[in-house]
Amino acid sequence: MIRADLYLQRIDFLRYLPGSDCRECGASSCAGLIRGLKDGTLSPSDCPSLPDHRVAAFSFALRAREILPVVPAFELPRPGYPGLVEINNPVGDSPVLVSGNSQFTQEVVTTILGFTVSPFRILFVDCRGDTVDMAMLYQSLTVDRIYRALAGTEPPGSGKVMELILPGFARELERPLIEKTGWSVQVGPICVAELPLFLGERWRMAEGW
């Protein structure tokens, strides 16, 4: 079986390193630190400036290959159910993670979210079952589709959706989505395994991490 590319190599570890000198972590440079983390000769806990939540997020991302499900590379779309899914009892201002409705994308995203106790909503937009990278290529993930998907899913008591987090491949939709909705929109990482790093203290790891 040919495995789908989950873009683990696109995780931007450098972005989340402490602003201090990486030599405090036992490496000669920050690039050397990342190499050491990836080959296992260094550990996130070697960095005294990294807070506990970031140590856990680094450890998680570094182990993503063994955590994520094996997904086959299919040429044809495999549509799953679109719609809004709630994780960990979200409240009115809990962020909404936007994704596509590929069955395999849904499996990967929900696997990652199984490792947090933080509240989120996930909006699986009907993009004909394309994975997000293909949905942007084929223009099946659009501002209008996201807007229509959200139209009937307003969080109770909030009056409006406060914050959307787009997948990294959908960066070009950020500005037009803000202009159309007036909502707060952020562009998240390309690889979903980077979410714990990207969200920082807003991502609380489940027990054991």
Q: What name fits each language-model region?
A:
Residues M1-A4, S20, E24-I178, G182-W209:
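Conserved mixed alpha/beta catalytic, RNA-binding, or beta-rich assembly cores of soluble enzyme
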Residues Y7-R23:
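Immediate flanking context of iron-sulfur cluster ligation sites
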